[in-house]
Amino acid sequence: HGTRGIEAHGEIVGDVVDAAVAARLTGTDFIFCCTDSMASRALINQLAYQYLVPAIDMGVAIRVVGGHVASVTGRVQMLAPELGCLVCGDGLDGNQVRWEMMSAAQRRADPYFENASVPQPAVMPLNGVVTSAAVAMFLSAFTSYPGEARMLHYDGVRGSVRPQLMPCRHDCIVCGPNGALARGSSWSLPVRHEQHHV
Protein backbone atom coordinates (compact mmCIF):
# COMPACT_ATOMS: atom_id res chain seq x y z
CA HIS A 1 0.00 0.00 0.00
CA GLY A 2 1.24 3.44 -0.86
CA THR A 3 0.79 6.25 1.62
CA ARG A 4 0.06 9.78 0.51
CA GLY A 5 2.04 12.32 2.42
CA ILE A 6 1.46 15.99 2.96
CA GLU A 7 4.49 18.21 2.80
CA ALA A 8 4.65 21.92 3.48
CA HIS A 9 7.26 23.90 1.59
CA GLY A 10 8.20 27.53 1.45
CA GLU A 11 7.26 30.62 3.29
CA ILE A 12 5.62 33.77 2.03
CA VAL A 13 5.89 36.80 4.28
CA GLY A 14 3.82 39.87 3.54
CA ASP A 15 0.32 41.23 3.20
CA VAL A 16 -1.70 38.95 0.90
CA VAL A 17 -3.55 41.92 -0.62
CA ASP A 18 -0.27 43.31 -1.98
CA ALA A 19 -0.06 42.42 -5.67
CA ALA A 20 3.38 40.76 -5.44
CA VAL A 21 2.37 38.53 -2.52
CA ALA A 22 -0.96 37.58 -4.12
CA ALA A 23 0.87 36.64 -7.33
CA ARG A 24 3.03 34.20 -5.37
CA LEU A 25 -0.04 32.63 -3.77
CA THR A 26 -1.49 31.74 -7.19
CA GLY A 27 1.16 29.02 -7.52
CA THR A 28 0.50 27.31 -4.19
CA ASP A 29 -1.31 24.00 -3.74
CA PHE A 30 -3.49 24.97 -0.77
CA ILE A 31 -4.18 27.96 1.49
CA PHE A 32 -5.35 28.12 5.10
CA CYS A 33 -6.96 31.55 5.49
CA CYS A 34 -6.66 32.70 9.11
CA THR A 35 -7.16 36.45 8.97
CA ASP A 36 -9.09 39.23 10.66
CA SER A 37 -9.00 41.38 7.52
CA MET A 38 -11.97 41.50 5.14
CA ALA A 39 -9.68 42.56 2.28
CA SER A 40 -7.38 39.56 2.68
CA ARG A 41 -10.39 37.27 3.07
CA ALA A 42 -11.89 38.67 -0.17
CA LEU A 43 -8.58 38.17 -1.98
CA ILE A 44 -8.15 34.55 -0.83
CA ASN A 45 -11.81 33.83 -1.65
CA GLN A 46 -11.43 34.99 -5.25
CA LEU A 47 -7.96 33.48 -5.71
CA ALA A 48 -9.26 30.04 -4.64
CA TYR A 49 -11.82 29.98 -7.46
CA GLN A 50 -9.99 32.02 -10.08
CA TYR A 51 -6.73 30.04 -9.89
CA LEU A 52 -8.28 26.75 -8.67
CA VAL A 53 -6.18 26.80 -5.49
CA PRO A 54 -8.36 25.27 -2.77
CA ALA A 55 -8.48 27.11 0.53
CA ILE A 56 -10.11 26.80 3.91
CA ASP A 57 -11.33 30.04 5.44
CA MET A 58 -11.92 30.18 9.15
CA GLY A 59 -13.16 32.86 11.46
CA VAL A 60 -14.34 33.45 15.00
CA ALA A 61 -16.58 36.04 16.61
CA ILE A 62 -17.60 36.95 20.12
CA ARG A 63 -20.70 39.12 20.38
CA VAL A 64 -21.20 41.15 23.54
CA VAL A 65 -24.56 42.71 24.41
CA GLY A 66 -24.99 44.89 27.47
CA GLY A 67 -21.59 43.93 28.82
CA HIS A 68 -22.32 40.18 28.63
CA VAL A 69 -21.19 37.60 26.10
CA ALA A 70 -24.22 36.82 23.93
CA SER A 71 -22.56 34.43 21.49
CA VAL A 72 -19.27 32.72 20.80
CA THR A 73 -19.11 31.40 17.25
CA GLY A 74 -16.69 29.97 14.74
CA ARG A 75 -16.90 29.09 11.06
CA VAL A 76 -14.80 26.82 8.83
CA GLN A 77 -15.48 26.85 5.09
CA MET A 78 -13.70 25.19 2.19
CA LEU A 79 -13.36 27.42 -0.87
CA ALA A 80 -13.18 25.29 -4.01
CA PRO A 81 -15.09 24.77 -7.29
CA GLU A 82 -18.64 23.45 -6.87
CA LEU A 83 -18.75 24.83 -3.31
CA GLY A 84 -20.30 28.19 -2.50
CA CYS A 85 -17.87 30.99 -1.73
CA LEU A 86 -17.83 33.76 0.86
CA VAL A 87 -19.82 36.01 -1.49
CA CYS A 88 -22.54 33.34 -1.80
CA GLY A 89 -22.73 33.09 1.98
CA ASP A 90 -22.73 36.87 2.53
CA GLY A 91 -19.47 36.47 4.44
CA LEU A 92 -17.79 39.60 3.10
CA ASP A 93 -18.50 43.24 3.92
CA GLY A 94 -17.84 45.16 0.68
CA ASN A 95 -17.52 48.51 2.46
CA GLN A 96 -14.97 47.08 4.89
CA VAL A 97 -13.00 45.53 1.99
CA ARG A 98 -12.98 48.90 0.23
CA TRP A 99 -11.80 50.70 3.37
CA GLU A 100 -9.02 48.21 4.05
CA MET A 101 -7.74 48.48 0.47
CA MET A 102 -7.35 52.27 0.72
CA SER A 103 -4.11 54.03 1.55
CA ALA A 104 -4.01 56.11 4.74
CA ALA A 105 -4.36 59.28 2.63
CA GLN A 106 -7.39 57.85 0.79
CA ARG A 107 -9.03 56.96 4.10
CA ARG A 108 -8.53 60.48 5.45
CA ALA A 109 -10.04 61.96 2.29
CA ASP A 110 -13.02 59.59 2.11
CA PRO A 111 -16.16 61.36 3.35
CA TYR A 112 -18.04 58.07 3.88
CA PHE A 113 -15.72 56.37 6.34
CA GLU A 114 -14.99 57.74 9.77
CA ASN A 115 -14.14 54.65 11.79
CA ALA A 116 -11.20 52.32 11.59
CA SER A 117 -11.60 48.59 11.49
CA VAL A 118 -12.38 47.00 14.84
CA PRO A 119 -10.37 43.79 15.10
CA GLN A 120 -11.88 40.76 16.79
CA PRO A 121 -9.95 39.64 19.85
CA ALA A 122 -7.85 36.51 19.54
CA VAL A 123 -9.17 33.95 22.03
CA MET A 124 -6.96 30.88 22.13
CA PRO A 125 -9.56 28.20 23.05
CA LEU A 126 -11.97 29.41 20.36
CA ASN A 127 -9.19 29.71 17.78
CA GLY A 128 -8.00 26.21 18.72
CA VAL A 129 -11.43 24.63 18.13
CA VAL A 130 -11.83 26.32 14.74
CA THR A 131 -8.26 25.54 13.66
CA SER A 132 -8.64 21.88 14.63
CA ALA A 133 -11.86 21.67 12.61
CA ALA A 134 -10.07 23.25 9.63
CA VAL A 135 -7.22 20.73 9.81
CA ALA A 136 -9.71 17.84 10.01
CA MET A 137 -11.58 19.26 6.99
CA PHE A 138 -8.29 19.53 5.06
CA LEU A 139 -7.35 15.94 5.92
CA SER A 140 -10.79 14.65 4.91
CA ALA A 141 -10.54 16.43 1.56
CA PHE A 142 -7.02 15.28 0.67
CA THR A 143 -6.39 12.03 2.53
CA SER A 144 -8.42 9.03 3.65
CA TYR A 145 -9.38 10.80 6.90
CA PRO A 146 -13.19 10.50 7.22
CA GLY A 147 -15.45 13.52 6.93
CA GLU A 148 -17.68 15.06 4.27
CA ALA A 149 -18.53 18.51 5.66
CA ARG A 150 -17.05 21.44 3.74
CA MET A 151 -18.64 24.11 5.92
CA LEU A 152 -18.97 23.98 9.70
CA HIS A 153 -20.43 26.34 12.30
CA TYR A 154 -19.28 26.21 15.93
CA ASP A 155 -21.49 27.46 18.76
CA GLY A 156 -19.22 27.96 21.76
CA VAL A 157 -22.08 28.67 24.15
CA ARG A 158 -23.82 25.37 23.37
CA GLY A 159 -20.59 23.48 22.64
CA SER A 160 -21.87 22.22 19.29
CA VAL A 161 -20.58 21.95 15.75
CA ARG A 162 -23.01 21.63 12.84
CA PRO A 163 -22.37 21.17 9.13
CA GLN A 164 -24.01 23.44 6.60
CA LEU A 165 -24.41 23.20 2.84
CA MET A 166 -23.35 26.32 0.95
CA PRO A 167 -24.51 26.07 -2.66
CA CYS A 168 -22.82 28.18 -5.30
CA ARG A 169 -25.05 30.99 -6.57
CA HIS A 170 -25.25 30.65 -10.35
CA ASP A 171 -24.83 34.43 -10.78
CA CYS A 172 -21.95 34.78 -8.29
CA ILE A 173 -19.13 37.01 -9.57
CA VAL A 174 -16.53 34.80 -7.85
CA CYS A 175 -17.57 31.13 -8.05
CA GLY A 176 -20.34 31.23 -10.66
CA PRO A 177 -19.75 30.06 -14.25
CA ASN A 178 -19.71 33.65 -15.56
CA GLY A 179 -17.50 34.94 -12.77
CA ALA A 180 -13.85 34.57 -11.83
CA LEU A 181 -14.04 30.75 -11.75
CA ALA A 182 -10.99 29.26 -13.53
CA ARG A 183 -10.14 32.59 -15.22
CA GLY A 184 -6.56 32.60 -13.97
CA SER A 185 -4.52 35.60 -15.05
CA SER A 186 -7.17 36.72 -17.57
CA TRP A 187 -9.02 38.42 -14.66
CA SER A 188 -7.64 40.84 -12.11
CA LEU A 189 -7.50 39.90 -8.46
CA PRO A 190 -8.67 42.44 -5.85
CA VAL A 191 -5.14 43.48 -4.87
CA ARG A 192 -3.44 46.62 -3.63
CA HIS A 193 -0.85 47.81 -6.13
CA GLU A 194 2.35 49.46 -4.97
CA GLN A 195 1.93 53.21 -5.03
CA HIS A 196 4.73 55.25 -6.54
CA HIS A 197 5.19 58.70 -5.09
CA VAL A 198 6.02 61.43 -7.58
Language model region names:
Residues 1-5:
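Glycine-rich phosphate-binding loop and adjoining beta1-alpha1-beta2 segment
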Residues 6-12:
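Rossmann-fold cofactor-recognition segment
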Residues 12-20:
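Conserved SAM/SAH-binding loop
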Residues 20-198:
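Glycine-rich phosphate/adenylate-binding loop
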